[in-house]
């Protein structure tokens, strides 16, 4: 078991940005896509673990229940609506319906089973309770694709962002930095650097029209964004050209204007125009229907700072000194021949990765150009280290990417530097040794925490290396593709 000196770390609960082109019905109100402020995409699992915060939440919930009793009593009374227009009556009825089912997104399959998914029932995805034994598309590729963009609310206009323009890239960075996913207690917000955004959004095959922005007509201010990038995905025995949808973000002041659903439908339309009809995506909420469920684990590298910013806390019978001793790491890696990846290593890293991923059911299929893009080291973005043996052969590699978070409202600490396990391939070096060295390298580079999902073979080292389990799941989804679900150990895909 993970040590008690750190509690489970909560995952944020983003709702999901994905391909949602309406079947002539438009975007219907439903419990899983109603809260527009949740419409931001996050895979990081970075959130504080703080008992006092949980207690405050419980107190708030009690107060809400007390207030709610008045509302419940009024709902029992017959409401006179004869003087209201029909549209207004429908809005009130929808609001009452949403209130009754609870507006928060479902975090577990049990919660999800009690929800109605009116919108998702119209989409080419399996139903939540459906047992899938077949493989293939839910619906055939579309021939008749809408040619004109979807209509935005008055005063807003579409803009394909040119991220090669440093000014435009800075605008996107600012939008995300000020409005993107926060944790449940509003203590941390993801801080994607401009350079990281270029890495994540411009892999080989990227298209400018898939960097889909929304601007205010009068001021040209960027107030919304969604993106797609191409990806060849191997799912069981099939290789399929898909997209990954990411970075759905709407300015906080516009979240009542229903901009997010239009963004989602528009990126879907643009992807369909390129002849792609499947997508892969992840979310911290349960929707119809996950193909796999993974959990984030967190390894303290700088326990004092993590405790000071309330990312974690001291448990009973643990002092700060004992906690720091518990998480102390060697000064240097122990694997002989471990060095940063170089350009000459691209072919062998490609070969090692391709062979290694064959044992999993959901994986990327990369060519050498893509391997260079995703793995060649870039400072403060992606780190890859290879193991070269005495004969000059590269036999193993480890990799992790950088995603800091802004720490809000703390007097001294402004940023939390997190490393995220990417792909780690072993043939000669034991995976436990490889990942122990990954922790040492991350600590040497100034990271505060090292995060990893329990996918692939990661479960074999998480507890042994003193990772603590997070308390939220990351769901993997496929759009317009049916296949049996799989355990986390068969998921071989890591999304930024």
Swiss-Prot record:
Its EC number is 2.3.1.97. One of its GO terms (molecular function) is peptidyl-lysine N6-myristoyltransferase activity. Gene3D superfamilies: 3.40.630.170. One of its GO terms (cellular component) is cytoplasm. Disruption phenotype: Complete embryonic lethality. Embryos die between 3.5 and 7.5 dpc. Ubiquitous. Residues 55-66 have a biased composition (Basic residues). The modification Phosphoserine is found at residues 31, 47, 83. SUPFAM superfamilies: Acyl-CoA N-acyltransferases (Nat). It catalyses: N-terminal glycyl-[protein] + tetradecanoyl-CoA = N-tetradecanoylglycyl-[protein] + CoA + H(+); N-terminal glycyl-L-lysyl-[protein] + tetradecanoyl-CoA = N-terminal glycyl-(N(6)-tetradecanoyl)-L-lysyl-[protein] + CoA + H(+). CDD domains: NAT_SF. Its main location: cytoplasm. Tetradecanoyl-CoA binds at residues 118-120, 247-250, 256, 258-260. InterPro entries: Acyl_CoA_acyltransferase, NMT, NMT_C, NMT_CS, NMT_N. It is a peripheral membrane protein. Keywords: Acyltransferase, Cytoplasm, Membrane, Phosphoprotein, Transferase. GO terms for biological process: in utero embryonic development; ketone metabolic process; N-terminal peptidyl-glycine N-myristoylation; protein localization to membrane. It is found in: Cytoplasm; Cytoplasm, Cytosol; Membrane. Residues 1-82 are annotated as: Disordered. It is an enzyme of class 2 (transferase). Adds a myristoyl group to the N-terminal glycine residue of certain cellular and viral proteins. Also able to mediate N-terminal lysine myristoylation of proteins: catalyzes myristoylation of ARF6 on both 'Gly-2' and 'Lys-3'. Lysine myristoylation is required to maintain ARF6 on membranes during the GTPase cycle. Required for normal embryogenesis. Belongs to the NMT family. This is Glycylpeptide N-tetradecanoyltransferase 1.
């Amino acid at each position: 078991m993970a040590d008690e000196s750190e509690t489970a770390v909560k995952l944020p609960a983003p709702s999901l940005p994905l391909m949602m082109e309406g079947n002539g019905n438009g975007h219907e109100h439903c419990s899983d896509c109603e809260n527009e402020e949740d419409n931001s995409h996050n895979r990081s699992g970075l959130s504080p673990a703080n008992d006092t915060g949980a207690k405050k939440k419980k107190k708030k919930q009690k107060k809400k229940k007390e207030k709610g009793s008045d509302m419940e009593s009024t709902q029992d009374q017959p409401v006179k609506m004869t003087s209201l227009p029909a549209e207004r009556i429908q809005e009130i009825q929808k609001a009452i319906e949403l209130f009754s089912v609870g507006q928060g997104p479902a975090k577990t399959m049990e919660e999800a089973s009690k929800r109605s998914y009116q919108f998702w029932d119209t989409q080419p995805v399996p139903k939540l309770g459906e047992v899938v034994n077949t493989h293939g598309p839910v619906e055939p590729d579309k021939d008749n694709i809408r040619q004109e963009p979807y209509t935005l609310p008055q005063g807003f206009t579409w803009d394909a962002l040119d991220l090669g323009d440093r000014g435009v890239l800075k605008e996107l960075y600012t939008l995300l930095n000020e409005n993107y996913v926060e944790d449940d207690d509003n203590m941390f917000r993801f801080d994607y650097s401009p350079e990281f955004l270029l890495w994540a959004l411009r892999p080989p095959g990227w298209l400018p029209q898939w960097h889909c922005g929304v601007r205010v007509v009068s001021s040209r201010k960027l107030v919304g964004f969604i993106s797609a990038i191409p990806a060849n995905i191997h799912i069981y025995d099939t290789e399929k050209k898909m997209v990954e949808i990411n970075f759905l973000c709407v300015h906080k002041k516009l979240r009542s204007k229903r901009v997010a659903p239009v963004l989602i439908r528009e990126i879907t339309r643009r992807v369909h125009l390129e002849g792609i009809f499947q997508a892969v995506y992840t979310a911290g909420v349960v929707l119809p229907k996950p193909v796999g469920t993974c959990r984030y684990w967190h390894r303290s590298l700088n326990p004092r700072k993590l405790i000071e910013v309330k990312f974690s806390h001291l448990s009973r019978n643990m002092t700060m000194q004992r906690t720091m001793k518990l998480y102390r790491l060697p000064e240097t890696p122990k694997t002989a021949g471990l060095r940063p990846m170089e350009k000459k290593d691209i072919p062998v890293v490609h070969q090692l990765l391709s062979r290694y991923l064959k044992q999993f059911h959901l994986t990327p299929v990369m060519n050498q150009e893509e391997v260079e893009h995703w793995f060649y080291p870039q400072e403060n973005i992606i780190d890859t280290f290879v193991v070269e043996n005495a004969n000059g052969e590269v036999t193993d590699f480890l990799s992790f990417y950088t995603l800091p978070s802004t720490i809000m409202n703390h007097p001294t600490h402004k940023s939390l530097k997190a490393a995220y396990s990417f792909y780690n391939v072993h043939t000669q070096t034991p995976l436990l040794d490889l990942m122990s060295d990954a922790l040492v390298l991350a600590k040497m580079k100034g990271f505060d925490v090292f995060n990893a999902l329990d996918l692939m073979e990661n479960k074999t080292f998480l507890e042994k290396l003193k990772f603590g389990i997070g308390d939220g799941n990351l769901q993997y989804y496929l759009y317009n593709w049916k296949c049996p679900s799989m355990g986390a150990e068969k998921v071989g895909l890591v999304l930024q």
